[in-house]
Each structure stands twice: as structure tokens, then as C-alpha cells.
């Protein structure tokens, strides 16, 4: 069985690079994007992507806007959101049932979220 294909989207180079390294060490195939526009291009070029790990707050296109645009074309794509915001109450109603992981996180916190997102049935 091949490694699940993930798209990691974060405008912070350090966070993205460290997270990608942790995910690769965890057995995942990871494509990195530094913006919503780059993520859309990566998804078009890589139809095998199963899951996006997306930062909420990015310049130009928020993580929520990115997910909305992706789901318009690929409704089966699942998402895990990562955020520096500790209080998630402002998100009520904006993400349906998406999984949220608060930065800073460890692989022990991120891995279960990724596994859960990958194991949920298709939409």
C-alpha cells in the first residue's frame, strides 16, 4: 500500500518545512504549498492528493476560502486545519466538521488528526 498523499499549505516557511519533515518521517507523501494559489495549482497537478493540512490565516486566500474553492472541484478532499488561534469559538459554522489542530503542535497531536481525517468516509 502506498503512502497517503498530503498537501501541506502554510505561508510560514519554517512551520511548513518542519511539519513536512514530521509528516514524511511518519510515512506520508507530502507536497508543500506556500499559498492558496500554489495549493490550487498543486491539486490540479496531483490528483492523488487525499488530504490537505491547511493554515487558517494566510495572505491573499484564507484556509477557509481555499477549502471552499477546492471542494467546488474536488468535494472528496478532506482537510485538517492548523492555527495559532487558541480560541476556536469564532469558527463555529465556518468549517462544518473539519478537524482543527492548534499551533504549536507535535507529531503526537497532528498524527491522530491526520489519521482521523483519512479514515472518515468520503463525502
Predicted regions and their residues:
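Short hydrophobic/Thr-rich beta-strand motif most characteristic of the beta2 strand and flanking loop
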Residues: 27-34, 42, 78
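Active-site residues of response regulator receiver
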Residues: 55
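Acidic catalytic/metal-coordinating carboxylates
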Residues: 34-38, 62-66
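Receiver (REC) domain active-site loop signature in two-component systems and cognate sites
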Residues: 58
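Two-component/phosphorelay signaling modules centered on CheY-like receiver
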Residues: 13-31, 98, 117
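C-terminal output helix
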Residues: 105-116, 122
Amino acid at each position: 500500500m502506498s503512502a497517503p498523499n498530503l498537501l501541506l499549505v502554510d505561508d510560514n516557511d519554517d512551520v511548513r518545512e518542519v511539519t513536512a519533515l514530521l509528516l514524511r518521517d511518519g510515512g506520508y507523501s507530502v507536497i508543500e504549498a506556500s499559498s492558496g494559489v500554489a495549493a490550487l495549482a498543486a491539486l490540479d497537478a496531483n490528483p492523488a492528493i487525499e488530504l490537505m493540512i491547511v493554515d487558517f490565516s494566510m495572505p491573499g486566500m484564507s484556509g477557509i476560502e481555499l477549502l471552499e474553492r477546492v471542494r467546488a472541484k474536488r468535494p472528496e478532499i478532506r482537510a485538517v486545519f492548523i492555527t495559532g488561534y487558541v480560541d476556536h469559538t469564532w469558527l463555529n459554522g465556518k468549517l462544518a466538521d473539519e478537524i482543527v489542530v492548534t499551533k504549536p503542535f507535535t507529531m503526537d497531536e497532528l498524527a491522530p488528526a491526520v489519521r482521523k481525517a483519512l479514515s472518515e468516509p468520503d463525502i
